[in-house]
From Swiss-Prot:
Disulfide bonding pattern of the chain: none
Domain of life: Viruses
Biased composition (Basic and acidic residues): 347-360
Segments for region (4 X approximate tandem repeats): 612-713
Organism: Camelpox virus (strain CP-1)
UniProt record similarity statement: Belongs to the poxviridae A25 protein family.
Assembly behavior: Interacts (via N-terminus) with protein A26.
Name of this protein: A-type inclusion protein A25 homolog
Function according to Swiss-Prot or TrEMBL: Structural protein that forms a matrix surrounding the mature virion (MV) through interaction with protein A26. Presence of protein A25 in the virion structurally prevents direct virus-cell fusion mechanism.
UniProt GO BP: viral process
Sorted UniProt keywords: Late protein, Repeat, Virion
Sequence repeats: 612-634, 639-661, 667-689, 691-713
Subcellular location(s) per record: Virion
Amino acid sequence: MELTNLIEKCTKLSKDFATEVEKLWNDELSSESGLSRKTRNVIRNILRDITKSLTTDKKSKCFCILERSTINGEQIKDVYKTIFNNGVDVESRINTTGKYVLFTVMTYAAAELRLIKSDEIFALLSRFFNMICDIHRKYGCGNMFVGIPAALIVLLEIDHINKLFSVFSTRYDAKAYLYTEYFLFLNINHYLLSGSDLFINVAYCAVSFSSPIRVPDYIMEALTFKACDHIMKSGDLKYTYAFTKKVKDLFNTKSDSIYQYVRLHEMSYDGVSEDTDDDDEVFAILNLSIDSSVDRYRNRVLLLTPEVASLRKEYSEAEPDYKYLMDEEVSAYDKHLPKPITNTGIEEPHATGGDKEDQPIKVVYPPNNDKDDAIKPHNPLEDPNYVPTITRTDIGIADYQLVINKLIEWLDKCEEECGNGGEFKTELEEAKRKLTELNAELSDKLSKIMSLERDSVHKTERIDRLTKEIKELRDIQNGTDDGSDSSEIDKKIIRELRESLDREREMRSKLEKELDTIRDGKVEGSCQRELELRRMWLKQRDDDLRAEIDKRRNVEWELSRLRRDIKECDKYKEDLDKAKATISNYVSRISTLESEIAKYQQDRDTLSVVRRELEEERRRVKDLESRLDECTRNQEDTQEVDALRSRIRELENKLTDCIESGGGNLTEISRLQSRISDLERQLNECRGNVTEISRLESRISDLERQLNDCRRNNETNAETERDATS
């Protein structure tokens, strides 16, 4: 169904989105959770519609329509506020697929509408993706993925993209595989695009995206691009294809499907498919012109996501799968051409009992102004400019080589059961001979087809070149004088070219007849050729994939080694920080001890002064003794003399004790100073060796104890000195 009006389209898509979320509302998140193609298309359609509304005067109306849509009777705006809860305990609230889809889509839509600065978008997405990692870590839902729309991606710098990539690459327990692949693709694409002239550009409205490599469908879905968007490619890309639609499931299973694709011959397309909201829409770019060594998505199983998302393979575990030959090639959709009328009352050939596959297909065009030609089937043979297009179908439908091999196997089995002398021996030998001849004929036809196709391509290119030259010569002829010599020469050249063109057309007609005879009449040659091409292609892709696997294995081994080295470095750094802290503590303690030693040196100086005073007191005592002797000789009263003598003896004893005590303290201080100097020297040596710290600690403790003893002795000496002076 084609949609045109923006508001009507937004209303319908918002309703579809709400309905899809309701269906998934109670599906609990788990390792098997994933979004179907229908759900992914619904998400892409609503985000595209909001992006388109940003360039109109209805900038916020589409978003308001989405907010007012109801889920289980409640508006989406209120439901979103409830499950978000200001970012508190989000991983516990978002526990189902429906809540996950609503949370991601509403966050992206609000960001598109309200944010325009790259830093603001980056800040929002950083917080948002950390919440996503918490959800994936809690429920292990590695296949859940709703990527950033292109409307936000184009506003981010490559540094922002790399930082967002690191959010997922560093959260090893998050199991957000598709998000990691998404940002890895954006990173690879940026650096390859900056150094390459080859590119494919997809754009709609004001949003565009360019890539020199293949773009998987889930990347296109995340960026919100569709096959109906404007596509432009550089002229050097010759083998480029756009997948547009899923046709059917392969082998009636959901593990793989057959898709339609369009080969991009022109440099620009205004869309290659119709703009619809169908559930089976697909959009992926296959670029076979790029070197496979720089492209992770050459493998078909990585380019096209299966219907069941949990069956998707990772890059490291994907087996070679190149079923591109099984997909159906279709022509590009042109919205300027009228649609074929299928209900015209003309009897179809197969309706009369004929074989449907053997009947020619008649394309009926709309009636024009001529009443006689109101309904006229188109006959390609009457069109001189008609070039037949040979399309491929499923290889398994008419692989006659496999049929021949099966028949030979069956005949061998019959011969064993019937015996060598059976009545059917002659018939069996004749059948084997015919099959052998048929096999040889198939090989001959195969080589002939390859030769004819090469000649056909060469002749077609030559015809196009000659046609272009004839057109140029006709333009020259129309602009010259008929009586001039150059005009005669031009006419002669034109006649020769026309004759050559007639010969080429005749040769081309023969080649087409031969191709029609072999490929349409005897399909086995075409199928055999396609089978061989597929085998060759598979072998080449298998070799490429094995080389990529080896490279990845080497890179992973190197990454593992680097991680181990980083862990060891972190451990050494932690030990070094601890050692530095310990050394800093000991340095501070040593500084304290040095200050105390300086204080005790001052006390030693004071003690020297005391010693000098004691010596002076000794001299005074001697002087007193001499005076006492003189007094004794001069006085007869001895009682006072005895008292003075006892006082002198007492003072002498105290003086002797003080001198002895002072000398001991000086000796102890000198010894401690020498030990402290030796300790300082050893400490300087120990600063380069962390193992000496413990020994220094014990020695410093002993030194502190001795200093405390010395302090007590000095206090005792001070008391003695006070007693002596008194």
